[in-house]
Regions:
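Generic structural detector for well-ordered beta-strands
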Residues: 16-18
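Glycine-rich beta-strand-centered segment in the early N-terminal region that forms part
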Residues: 20-34, 47-94
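Cytochrome P450 core scaffold surrounding the K-helix E-X-X-R motif
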Residues: 39-45
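A generic beta-sheet turn/junction motif
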Residues: 7-10, 88
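Short N-terminal binding/cap micro-motifs at the start of the first secondary-structure element
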Residues: 11-14, 38-39
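Extreme N-terminal starter segment of soluble prokaryotic enzymes
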Residues: 1-2
Length: 96
């Protein structure tokens, strides 16, 4: 599969990457649409000091569930269209 990388500030490339292998308790998703948000733009511009490179941007997306545990606690099933809440808030860092 293909992935867009920000290799360094101002440098973007498309690379071949291995298909991820789903582990127990995880879902495998096929990304349908991805958004570009301020942190993605900041990583491209090099304005966020805590980002490492290279990085794959795109934490705001919609996707189709390809694989999921059969009896997961959330009722997620293959074929469902999903999105995620990509935010983990510590309440103490610069971003928070």
């Amino acid at each position: 599969m293909k992935a867009m990388y920000i290799d360094a500030p101002g440098q973007v490339s498309i690379k071949d990457v291995e298909m991820p292998v789903r582990k127990e308790g995880e879902v495998l998703l096929k990304i349908l649409y991805g958004g570009i948000c301020g942190s993605d733009l900041g990583s491209y511009r090099g304005t966020f000091a805590y980002f490492d490179y290279p990085r794959i941007p795109g934490h705001e997306f919609s996707a189709e569930v390809i694989e999921a545990d059969e009896n997961n606690a959330y009722g997620i099933k293959p074929g469902m269209i999903v999105t995620c809440n990509p935010y983990f808030n510590c309440g103490h860092c610069y971003s928070c």
